[in-house]
Amino acid sequence: MKLFLVRHGETDANRVLGHSVEGPMHNEPVIFKSGDDTNIPLNIVGRGQAEHAGGELPGVIDELYASPLLRVKETAEIIAGTKNIDPKNIQFRAELIEYHQGSLEGLTASEQKERMGVDSRGSGLLCNYNYTPWGGDNWETIYSRLSSFFDELKKHGHDKNIVCITSGGVIRMAYKIFLKDKSPSITKHIMIKNGSIHEFVID
C-alpha cells in the first residue's frame, strides 16, 4: 500500500502568522485552528496549493479520505477535481481531524502562559501525551485513533494508492506512528507545509 498524506492548503490564519503552524512539538507559536469557531476556508493561495498537490499525486487514486474540517474538505474537493473523482466518493473520517486544544484553542504560546500560569512549551506540558486541556484532546488519544485508522487501511489497502487529506499535527503524528517513536525530537526537522505531500510505503 502506498499512503499519501496531504496537508490542507493555506488559510488566512496561516498567512497572517507568516509561517506554517504545525503544533506544540516544535518551536513555533502555538496556535491551532480546528474547532467550529475557527473552521475557516482556504484562501486563494491555498486553493492553488491544493490544485498543485493534485497534479503531483499518482494518476490513479484508489481511495480518498479527508478530515471534515472546512479547509481540509475544500482541499480534498479540489484534489478530487484534478483526478476526475466524484466529490461524493471522498470519505470523511473523524480520525483525521486536527488536535484540538480546547480552552487553549487559538492562543499564542505567551497567551497560553498567561492563562495557565506556566509555559506550555517550555514545560513540555503540551508534549505530554496524557495532558488534556479543558474541552480538548490529548496526544495519546490522537495517536490511538490514528493508529487504528491506519490498521484499518492496511487490512484492505494492499497494492492500492490511498490519499488522506488532513492537517499538520495529524501528519506529524503519522510519522511518529510509522517510525514507532513518540519523542518530540523525532519530527522536529520535518517540514509540513501547506499543500505538502508525505508518502509512506506500507507492507
How would you label these PLM feature ranges?
Residues 30, 140, 181-203:
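Domain-level recognition of soluble alpha/beta enzyme cores
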Residues 2-85, 115:
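Active-site-proximal alpha-helix that buttresses catalytic centers in soluble enzyme cores
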Residues 32-38, 120-141:
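Short glycine/proline- and acidic residue-enriched helix-loop micro-motifs
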Residues 3, 158-169:
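Generic beta-sheet signal
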Residues 57-60, 153-160:
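Glycine-rich phosphate-binding loop signature in dinucleotide/nucleotide-binding domains
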Residues 108-121:
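A polyampholytic, Gly/Pro-enriched intrinsically disordered region
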Residues 61-68, 91, 161-165:
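Short glycine-rich phosphate-binding loop at a beta-alpha junction
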Residues 68, 86-105:
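A short, structured active-site edge motif that brings together acidic residues
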